[in-house]
Amino acid sequence: MKVTLIAILTCAAVLVLHTTAAEELEESQLMEVGMPDTELAAVDGERLFECSVSCEIEKEGNKDCKKKKCKGGWKCKFNMCVKV
């Protein structure tokens, strides 16, 4: 009976430690890859501005609004680039 209880507690402890280590590894990988948050915010702002200005210029020229293609997982919707 004691051996079974010790085995169960050991497995639970290993599971908790493994889960914690996996979460920490994932967080560290996310922080290392890509751009800092401030640069991402600037890129997002540029994409929104870029798409809406493109459509407004085309409308003023009495042409149909051909939405500017957004790249890298973004699409133009309601004159704005939105993440797909």
Swiss-Prot record:
Organism lineage: Eukaryota, Metazoa, Ecdysozoa, Arthropoda, Chelicerata
Signal peptide: 1-22
Top-level taxon of origin: Eukaryota
Protein name: U4-theraphotoxin-Hhn1a
GO terms of molecular function: toxin activity
Alphabetically ordered keywords of this record: Disulfide bond, Neurotoxin, Postsynaptic neurotoxin, Secreted, Signal, Toxin
SUPFAM superfamilies: omega toxin-like
Organism the protein comes from: Cyriopagopus hainanus
Propeptide: 23-47
Subcellular location: Secreted
Family: Belongs to the neurotoxin 12 (Hwtx-2) family. 02 (Hwtx-2) subfamily.
UniProt function note: Postsynaptic neurotoxin.
